[in-house]
Structures are given as C-alpha cells and as structure tokens.
Amino acid sequence: MAKSSKKKSFSVSQMSQLIDKISDETKIIIEDSTEQGYINTDIYIMNALLSKSILSGGVCDDRITIFAGPPNTGKSYLIYNIARNAQKAGKFILFIDTEHSVSRQVLQGFGLDTNVDNLKLISSNKVEDLKIFLTKFLDGLKTAKDDGAEIPEVVIFLDSIGQLASEKEKQDALDGKNKQDMTRAKSIKQLFRVINSDLGYLGIPMIATNHTYEDTTAFFPIQIMSGGKGAEYSASTIVFLSTAKLKTGREDEMDLNSSGVIVTAQSRKNRIAKPKKVKFEIDHEYGTNKFKGLEYFCTPENFEKVGIAKGKKSEEDGVIGLNPGGTRWYVRHLDKSFFEKQLYTPEVFTQEVLEALEPIIYKYFDYSSFEEQQSFVEKMEKDEIIEDKDFDEIDNDDLF
C-alpha cells in the first residue's frame, strides 16, 4: 500500500520573508512606514486645503503637487514660499525654470538661500532633456541609497509644465514647418511616468506649476491643464487658482485699480483632504496674511472653543458668552470687539486660538473614516426599515 504524501506547509511568515527578499533584490517598495510629512505654505487655510491641518500641514513632502492657473494667479509666489520653508527644514532645493523667468536675485528676494550647496537653479524647457536629466539624477540617488548612504533631503520645483516643449516642436520650427505638435503631451506623460516611482522610492516631492486654458468643447466650458493628462494622473494633489482684484483703499492712479489679488484656490484632486475651495489674499505691498480665511470657522457655534465670533459680548453668572449678529467681531481673550480688517493679527489669532481651531478645521477637511461610513449605512438601513413598516401600516382608505 502506497504511503500518502504529506503536503509541506508554507506559512504566511515564510511568504512575507520571500516578498522581502525579492524586494531587496529588485528594489521594489513594498511598504512605507514613515510618517507623512508636510512643507508649510505660510498660509494657514492653504495648509488645511492641502492636508487638513493648519498647524502641521502643507504640501506633501514625498508626492507630486501641482498649482495650476492663468497668469498672475500666484502660482510662482506660492512655490517660492514653499521653497523657503523647505530650506528652513534643511532640504536641498532643485529648481527647474522652463520659462526663463527665475534668477538667483528673484529667489533671494523671497528669502531663499541661493548658495550652490543649498540650491541649484536649472533653466531648460525641452521635455526630453529634462527626462534624461531627472532620470539620471534620481538613479544616482537610488544607487547611493541602495549602497547604504544617507541621501540629502531634496525638493524638486518645476516652473512650469505648461512651458515645456518637445524635440519635434523645436525641430519643426527649425525646418520652417508650422504643424501642430502631437508628441508634446505624450513626452510630458513619459517624463512623469518615468520619474514618479523613483520620486516615491527616494521620498522626494515635486512641486510644479502649470498653465490652464478653457476647454470650449465641453458642454459647460471648464478650465483644464496644459500638457495633456500625464501630469494629472501622476500628481497626488492638484490645486487650480483664480483671482479677483484686491482693493484696500490705498490705490493710486498708477495701481491699475487694485492693491493685489484675491486668490481662490480650488482643490481639483487630493488624496489626503476633501476637495474644497478657499480664499486668501496677496497684497503687492505686504504679501499674504497667513490668518486670512480662518474667520470662516470663527462662528457662534464654535465660540465656546475658539473665543472669536461675529457678535456682541454677553455675560451671565460670570460666564462670558456671545449674542450673534452685527458687523464687529468679539475676541474673548482680549475682551475687545474688532472690525474684520483688524482681525488678522497674531494678537487675535494666538497660538491658543490656532490650537482650538485645529481640530475644527481638520474635521471639516477630513474624509469620513470607515467606521463613520458604516455607521451612516446602518442608519440608512434602519431608516428604510422604519419607513417600510410605516408604509405597510397605512390603510388603503388613507391613500385615496
């Protein structure tokens, strides 16, 4: 009688070890246990739009983020501020200028250290050349990392995607051919497809700007990004910017009827925070006020926690409260009322106030958790059962 063959076991632990072994050999990332980090934008409400948190949020420090919009909407202004804060956090800046509009003097004016040991500025707008450069640069860092070296923290800025040209586009111009370039979008898509995985492996963020134009073929005309869909697919966060004139009363006849711009930032794609839109201001003389936009959450409902809201002070049994209404804002910790234009100061929005606002704003921008979604489904199912029961109990005479 033949002996029955006993099957050998292959445990989950062995399978996990096999995956680890193959990953080491092929350099494939199987997990990322590092905590998500962010680079401050210097505008609290923009931090929340990008990452939910006003205090510790901002641009993801290991993903692709794109700010897109028409000219003069603050795209470059935003990335200069982000670059400055990245340097403060000890990161090296690789700045790629495709518009030939950035100089070391411009960057210095925004507070950046342009020493070559802290920042490299590259000017090129040919997408194929940039693909080769970035691929070789990232591959060199990967080799160093795989050899056990601790590589510097790097942030790549690309200003802008919309100004990238293809080899064919340039060659057609040299040949005197006035043809539409059908290869440009494909080349840009290749660029992002080639570098995206390496950026993730190295934990390097790319923060880019892009142009937008109106798609008139859509049923309702909408703004879309230049350069095709490649960058859109690769980016984790895409924010569209638009502007209106900012009038402060300081304008003179040479100010083009405005003192700056009111920027509307709309999150078109975000894997971390709910897609929302916020507003902030860029004053040509004073820059941005980082507190602007926080007043939206200073409501009578939040007054007990935050201590700022539009209304008048009330007091009963020694407890300070609020009578909502009016045009002035009552600030509890200062025991004073302010007009809105006086509101946006560190004396009003103290660290204690910001910490009180943090969980309120975080929840507003946060996606629902799995438990919250399940609770909602269960409630809906329960409500359906009650409605069905109520309907069954209706007499036919009640229907007519």
Predicted regions and their residues:
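Phosphate-binding/switch region of NTP-binding enzymes
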Residues: D181-F297, E301
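Conserved catalytic network of the ASCE P-loop NTPase/AAA+ motor domain
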Residues: S56-C60, N85-A89, G111-N115, G140-E150, ...
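Conserved inter-motif catalytic segment of the P-loop NTP-binding fold
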Residues: A89-Q180, Q190
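Hydrophobic/aromatic beta-strand patches that form the interior of the parallel beta-sheet core
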Residues: T65-F67, L94-I96, K120-I122, I207, ...
